[in-house]
Amino acid sequence: MSRMAEQQLYIHGGYTSATSGRTFETINPANGNVLATVQAAGREDVDRAVKSAQQGQKIWAAMTAMERSRILRRAVDILRERNDELAKLETLDTGKAYSETSTVDIVTGADVLEYYAGLIPALEGSQIPLRETSFVYTRREPLGVVAGIGAWNYPIQIALWKSAPALAAGNAMIFKPSEVTPLTALKLAEIYSEAGLPDGVFNVLPGVGAETGQYLTEHPGIAKVSFTGGVASGKKVMANSAASSLKEVTMELGGKSPLIVFDDADLDLAADIAMMANFFSSGQVCTNGTRVFVPAKCKAAFEQKILARVERIRAGDVFDPQTNFGPLVSFPHRDNVLRYIAKGQEEGARVLCGGDVLKGDGFDNGAWVAPTVFTDCRDDMTIVREEIFGPVMSILTYETEDEVIRRANDTDYGLAAGIVTADLNRAHRVIHQLEAGICWINTWGESPAEMPVGGYKHSGIGRENGVMTLQSYTQVKSIQVEMAKFQSIF
């Protein structure tokens, strides 16, 4: 693909130049080619976007629930009509295989938008009787202007996961995509406008997180910030949001999730789940189950099943329908993953497979890392303690149920967890003791629109998806009505 035209900001229903004068480049990580130069939003641009959003939000919130629902449903239809076009752009920008982006990224994002479009008319208050002459009623009102700050691994899906409930509740959103993968969020803004969303209700500000993101989190005109990213960045966002105007926050942060295989499990099923929990999207999924606990007596058999499945991984041309493994999202990220792999070897973990970059025709110019499996791992190893966010699996062994529960919970993270077992009683007994917000039994990775997702401990605050997320984009107003004569003590 030839280099795209310079990308601008999207404010008040159309493209506009950044006043900052700064730009950055977005790269195709499969081959290292520059996709586009992108303008970076500065402080004045954030001010413009907030004013635009404030104007648009008043118009949007004044519409009936059915009017808002119809507009969002039109956006869903356009997303599905343009699935292939958007998936191709997402593949170019992220490096993910087209077989993945065309069946997951836009599809699941559109599903979430459709889900919230359907919930809009059901967003209701309540009536509370006090006595014969008095009652209270409540209203769920929009927060106003909210900000979404996205991560680079699922650009358009995250933009939809954040904007769908926010818009459904009557808010306007200013969205800052990751500077690594900014392109499809701009296309989403076009689609919202085409569907009939009032100008200003969804503005997109590409830019560097330390600048554009900070301006958003500090801005007094922003009522809430929804952030997806790393723990360290999330803490800064939260601190800025509280210090500036006591904003509400939703934080979807990192994970180092355990996948526990029990001795009664079907090892073929367990190996299939472990592969998806580590190598789907080249390991760049926040919920990945990278700490794979297996009974000591099952270790050798499990390792052989993993090795057989690694042989089935098809890396290569990301637009080949048979390819199911792409490069990492950027060269700096590739180098960081390679540092972790080197650290694992240095600390004594044994490389079962991988452990280096992929080499040869089609790989040498891209950010490719081979699917890597470590075994003989210990809980104190860096690769077991820290989030790598790449195609790196760590296999650990255990002896008893109590032991593995304790070790699985021995982490600052608490995003996800999963178990594989044929024992229904054990499944629920163990899951109820795991300190994680998203749990799977005999499966991994699915996050449907109806399912609230979010983390315990350092993995986040609040939830995305589900009914409770729609409610989190509202504020409750309580009104008491007195029908009898008011009695004063004065």
From Swiss-Prot:
InterPro entries per the UniProt record, alphabetical: Ald_DH/histidinol_DH, Ald_DH_C, Ald_DH_CS_CYS, Ald_DH_CS_GLU, Ald_DH_N, Aldehyde_DH_dom, BADH
SUPFAM superfamilies: ALDH-like
Catalysed reactions listed for this entry: betaine aldehyde + NAD(+) + H2O = glycine betaine + NADH + 2 H(+)
CDD domains per UniProt: ALDH_F9_TMBADH (cd07090)
Pathway, per record: Amine and polyamine biosynthesis; betaine biosynthesis via choline pathway; betaine from betaine aldehyde: step 1/1
GO MF term list: betaine-aldehyde dehydrogenase (NAD+) activity; metal ion binding
Cysteine sulfenic acid (-SOH): modified positions: 286
Binding site for K(+) 1: 26-27, 93, 180
Active-site residues from the entry: 162 (charge relay system), 252 (proton acceptor), 286 (nucleophile), 464 (charge relay system)
Pfam families: Aldedh
EC number(s) recorded for this UniProt protein: 1.2.1.8
PROSITE patterns (UniProt xref): ALDEHYDE_DEHYDR_CYS, ALDEHYDE_DEHYDR_GLU
Entry cofactors: K(+)
PANTHER family: ALDEHYDE DEHYDROGENASE-RELATED
UniProt xrefs under HAMAP family: BADH
Protein name, UniProt field: Betaine aldehyde dehydrogenase
Organism: Escherichia coli O9:H4 (strain HS)
